[in-house]
Amino acid sequence: MIGVVATLNVAAGKEAEFETAMLALAAQVRANEPGNHLYTLCKDDEGNYVVMELYENEEALAAHGQSEHFKASGASFKGLMAGPPSIKRMAVVG
């Protein structure tokens, strides 16, 4: 299993639009990627966002990046981000 934590820099005032777009993407990931076990948007008390992801294997992670819904989602996030995401990849222990 492969874990991914994506820290997202959302533009001020764009939080509601971002959440709508990200939740739509998350629904597509869960519906269309059998190798994905978790794709969840989280927000802390300060308004910082992360997406927590869990994939069965390398093939599932690669399929996510190549999926049509993931590629198409870029247009949904245009103008909503304050900067690039920080992606941290981790191995699942146990």
Residue ranges and their predicted role:
Residues 2-32, 37:
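N-terminal first-folded block
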Residues 2-9, 38-65:
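Short, well-ordered beta-strand segments in beta-rich or mixed alpha/beta enzyme
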Residues 14, 47, 69:
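Short phosphate-engaging motifs
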Residues 90-94:
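Short hydrophobic/aromatic patches at helix-to-coil boundaries
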Residues 43, 88-89:
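Structural signal for conserved beta-strand scaffold positions within catalytic alpha/beta enzyme cores
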Residues 24-38, 54-88:
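An amphipathic, aromatic/His-enriched active-site/gating alpha helix that lines ligand/cofactor pockets
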